[in-house]
Amino acid sequence: MSENQDLQKSFLETVKFDDKGLVPAIVQDFETGKVLMMAWMNRQSLEMTLEKKKACYWSRSRQKLWLKGESSGNMQNVHDILIDCDGDTLLLKVSQTGGACHMGYQSCFYRKTKDDLSMEICDTLMFNPEDVYGKQS
């Protein structure tokens, strides 16, 4: 299919969901380009995101839609949604309120390896998760 023919298809027709009906979504800060998180979307969460311009994902652990920030207040306003060349990965460019990570950090990628293979924190703690979500067992 030529590039021009491909652009004639609708965005939703182009997305290749996996055998579970999911597609990975990489989430990036609209202003800085910093990668904030990776989450899964199904068709319903993607349609809701397109309609509301607020990020909505599919929670594999809870098996339900997850409007980012509904319990924490750390919403993601969606500016752009890009699709990769294979159609099987999305990139959401968002304005993030508060931290993206449920551990309280700006990004879920808040740890990096050191030369000795230990890890160090490399991100900003935005909130105390116990204050937002309560004590985790």
Swiss-Prot record:
It is found in: Cytoplasm. Its cofactor is Mg(2+); Zn(2+). GO terms for cellular component: cytoplasm. It holds the Pfam family PRA-CH. Mg(2+) binds at D84, D86, D88. PANTHER family: HISTIDINE BIOSYNTHESIS BIFUNCTIONAL PROTEIN, HISTIDINE BIOSYNTHESIS BIFUNCTIONAL PROTEIN HIS7. Catalyzes the hydrolysis of the adenine ring of phosphoribosyl-AMP. This is Phosphoribosyl-AMP cyclohydrolase.
